[in-house]
A protein has these predicted regions:
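Gly/Pro-rich turn-and-neighbor structural signature
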Residues: 78, 203-204
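Extracytoplasmic/periplasmic membrane-proximal domains and adjacent transmembrane bundles
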Residues: 195-200
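Soluble periplasmic/extracytoplasmic beta-strand elements of cell-envelope proteins
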Residues: 93-97, 201-203, 216-220
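AMP-binding (ANL) adenylation modules
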Residues: 207-210
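Interaction-mediating elements
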Residues: 1-193, 212-214
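Transmembrane beta-strand segments of Gram-negative outer membrane beta-barrel proteins
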Residues: 222-227
Length: 227
């Protein structure tokens, strides 16, 4: 089968606009951490073969664009296709569809809601997190807390094993920003390059504030050498 007609139009104008984004002009000074140009190239096109692998990659591509632009709760399972091959001409008409966000209410029922963008509220870096700790080692004991350019830095038992400015510069997730998976990837990469740290783990907690969805971010790290 070949695709005769292909439609990708979503009822939410903001999501529809993001799904049709064109690649921004790349600065020669831009980070080479991840080439994002491919994410802006539509994979499903009229006249091409009907290929299930390509259809799945297109769902992944749009999911990536949305998660780069605030849609923390979005995943590829919200996207699907409606295919019509009733023409008996080895062609198919294809529409991409999007399911609404399904929120589980306190009473256990499920309510369909629009997909919402999330903003970063607070960012906290914990420098002595022990993911394998038991007993006393399982608890985090703060010995010092600092605020550096909006990032909370909490030192533990090992004290200031790394300068606050280094941790801040390695943190691409900042309060007030739209959630972006790209910022998470850059933060993981920056922290992985710090030899004084290991076992970096980034977690989020949802917070609803004045009808705005926000996320508290926790960057959990362990010192490479325990004093």
């Amino acid at each position: 089968y070949r695709i005769r007609n292909y439609t990708m139009k979503f009822p939410d104008p903001k999501i529809d606009s993001l799904a049709h984004l064109k690649a921004p002009r790349r600065s020669p000074l831009a980070s080479a951490f991840r080439s994002s140009q491919e994410e802006y190239n539509q994979l499903v096109k009229e006249g091409t073969l009907f290929d299930r692998d390509i259809l799945d990659k297109e769902r992944e591509r749009i999911t990536t664009l949305l998660r780069w632009n605030g849609y923390y709760g979005f995943n590829r399972d919200y996207l699907g296709y409606i295919a019509d091959s009733s023409f008996n001409q080895n062609v198919v008409d294809l529409d991409m569809s999007m399911k609404p966000y399904r929120k589980v209410l306190p009473n256990g029922s499920v309510e369909d809601q629009p997909h919402r963008q999330y903003y970063i509220k607070d960012v906290t870096v914990l420098t002595d997190y022990n993911p394998m700790g038991v007993g006393e080692d399982a608890s985090f004991m703060a010995t010092d807390t600092m605020l550096s350019a909006g990032v909370n830095i909490v030192y533990g038992r090992n004290g200031k094993s790394i300068r606050p400015s280094v941790l801040r510069r390695s943190t691409y997730i900042r309060p007030g920003q739209l959630f972006s998976e790209k910022n998470i990837e850059q933060t993981y990469s920056a922290f992985a390059s710090l030899r004084a740290l290991r076992n970096v783990n980034i977690r989020f907690t949802e917070v609803e504030e004045r009808d705005t969805m926000k996320l508290d971010c926790y960057i959990l790290t362990s010192p490479a050498k325990i004093n």
